[in-house]
């Protein structure tokens, strides 16, 4: 099995936000034992969903849960800057196109209990690949092997891929950058994801300006459909 090493700078970054993601992990655990397969998305690129996916997966693994992180943002993966391969690797697109077995794409890491499925090469038809039978077949094959499966998806505000992926998940989390995305776009993204039939677990407000906000501003994670003034 191919091994991936998480780069030191990313580990240090994750350490700085460890308490924050431990709190998010706890909220997810309290949301229900049935919520094991989670899609992570955002409205636009650059809001921090991939970092959130990785940090959440790390938190789960470090808490003792056997965790699989799937990089399903096959159009614009940034995880190659987080995990470095010790050899030639195959990824999700190789499997979905029928050019690799499932066992070929699940990689061990230098973090105990954390395994990763890389995205693979950028395909000419990302949406069509996700809609074929291989994706659901993969989820069925692995869902009882891992305690949690975290799937980093493309931004729902740009392409429909995230909703397709979410249809095979127990729930989804929406990551949004503070001060960047208007509320109506966030609401629309939430509605698009809910059309998949997946359960909305909450919004993570990311990249908050600490000069005008405190740790307490993250406390609404997991609260759904709150009444707004």
Curated annotation (Swiss-Prot):
Listed under GO biological process in this entry are: capsule polysaccharide biosynthetic process
Annotated effect of mutating residue 54 to I: In strain: CNTC 1/82
User: Which terms in the GO cellular component ontology are assigned?
Assistant: plasma membrane
Q: What post-translational changes are documented for it?
A: Autophosphorylated.
Instruction: Report a single Gene Ontology molecular function.
Output: ATP binding
Impact of changing residue 173 to I on the protein? In strain: CNTC 1/82
- What does the record say about activity regulation? Dephosphorylated and activated by CpsB.
Q: Does the keyword Transferase apply?
A: yes
Gene3D superfamilies the record matches: P-loop containing nucleotide triphosphate hydrolases
Provide the alphabetized UniProt keywords.
Answer: ATP-binding, Capsule biogenesis/degradation, Exopolysaccharide synthesis, Kinase, Nucleotide-binding, Phosphoprotein, Transferase, Tyrosine-protein kinase
InterPro entries named among the record's database cross-references: AAA_dom, Bact_polysacc_biosynth/exp, P-loop_NTPase, Wzc-like_C
What reaction gets catalysed by this protein?
Answer: L-tyrosyl-[protein] + ATP = O-phospho-L-tyrosyl-[protein] + ADP + H(+)
Q: In which pathway does it act?
A: Capsule biogenesis; capsule polysaccharide biosynthesis
Q: What is its EC number?
A: 2.7.10.2
Under Pfam families, the record lists: AAA_31 (PF13614)
Described function:
Involved in the regulation of capsular polysaccharide biosynthesis. Autophosphorylation of CpsD attenuates its activity and reduces the level of encapsulation. May be part of a complex that directs the coordinated polymerization and export to the cell surface of the capsular polysaccharide.
Hey, which family's this protein in? Answer: Belongs to the CpsD/CapB family.
Checking PANTHER family in the record gives: FERRIC ENTEROBACTIN TRANSPORT PROTEIN FEPE, TYROSINE-PROTEIN KINASE
- Protein's recorded name: Tyrosine-protein kinase CpsD
Instruction: State the organism of origin.
Output: Streptococcus agalactiae
Taxonomy-wise, where does this protein's organism fall, top ranks first? Bacteria, Bacillati, Bacillota, Bacilli, Lactobacillales
């Amino acid at each position: 099995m191919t091994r991936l090493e998480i780069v030191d700078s990313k580990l240090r970054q994750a350490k700085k936000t460890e308490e924050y993601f431990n709190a998010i992990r706890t909220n997810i655990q309290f949301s229900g034992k049935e919520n094991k397969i989670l899609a992570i998305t955002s409205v636009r690129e650059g809001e921090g969903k991939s970092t959130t996916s990785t940090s959440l997966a790390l938190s789960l693994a470090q808490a003792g849960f056997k965790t699989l992180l799937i990089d399903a943002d096959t159009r614009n993966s940034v995880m190659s800057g987080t995990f470095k391969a010790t050899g030639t690797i195959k990824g999700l697109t190789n499997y979905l196109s029928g050019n690799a077995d499932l066992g070929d794409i699940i990689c061990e890491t230098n973090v105990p209990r954390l395994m990763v499925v890389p995205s693979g090469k950028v395909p000419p038809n990302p949406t069509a690949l996700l809609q074929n039978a291989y994706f659901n077949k993969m989820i069925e094959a692995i869902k009882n092997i891992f305690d949690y499966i975290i799937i980093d998806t493309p931004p729902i505000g740009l392409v429909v891929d995230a909703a397709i992926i979410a249809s095979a998940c127990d729930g989804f989390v929406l990551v949004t950058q503070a001060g960047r995305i208007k509320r109506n776009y966030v609401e629309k993204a939430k509605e698009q994801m809910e059309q998949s039939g997946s359960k909305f677990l909450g919004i993570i407000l990311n990249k908050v300006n600490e000069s005008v906000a405190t740790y307490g501003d993250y406390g609404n994670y997991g609260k759904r459909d709150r009444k707004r003034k």
